[in-house]
Amino acid sequence: MTVQRFALPVDRLTRLIDEHQFDLYNDPMPTMAALDGYLGDTRGALFALAARIVVGAVADIDHLVHHAGLAQGILHLIASLPRDGARRQLFIPLDLLARHGLGQEQVFAAKATPVIRAMLAELRGQARQHLDHTLELAREAPGGVRPALLPLALVSRDLVRAERRIDADPFQPQLRSRLATLWTLWRAARSPAFRER
């Protein structure tokens, strides 16, 4: 069994499962702090488990994988807005909506207003900060951990694309070419940022 073979921490897997219970209901994400915890225990946990499988137990990477999970998770939250909004499920924290003078119903209306665009720009800015911090921390991390961070190459590419297309309708799904995905991963796997030292 994979858990035993790689000595994966069962408590981390349990938290991952427990946090995903939130996905089953239409309760809104209450605060940015709650989103931080959710993404840390879901997306961040996957990066931590991948690192554990690749190099074994590594000390002092929790901060690194937490930021990696936040960068990937925030960008995924934005990309999933069309699907989640159609299901009346909201992962954008209520306190962020309130700070921009928005309510849930305005998001569910699926109209790309300037206020919604500003709120999403703030989220993209946070994703950018977490991604930049992760890549900075990865430079000092043990070299074997870097391949486990390879999905961040897609986060970086998608974030650049989103930052360039600020006038795109956030409620229309943005399709990602499979060939472009493979090309991005192939190129990143050969770059110093993601290669073992």
Label the predicted regions.
Residues 2-21, 35-48, 58-73, 78, ...:
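Catalytic cores of Mg2+-dependent Asp-rich isoprenoid enzymes
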Residues 23-26:
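Short membrane-interface loop/juxtamembrane segments of multi-pass integral membrane proteins
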Residues 29:
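Glycine/charged-rich beta-loop-alpha catalytic/anionic-binding loops adjacent to active sites
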Residues 49-53:
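Alpha-helical transmembrane segments of multipass membrane proteins
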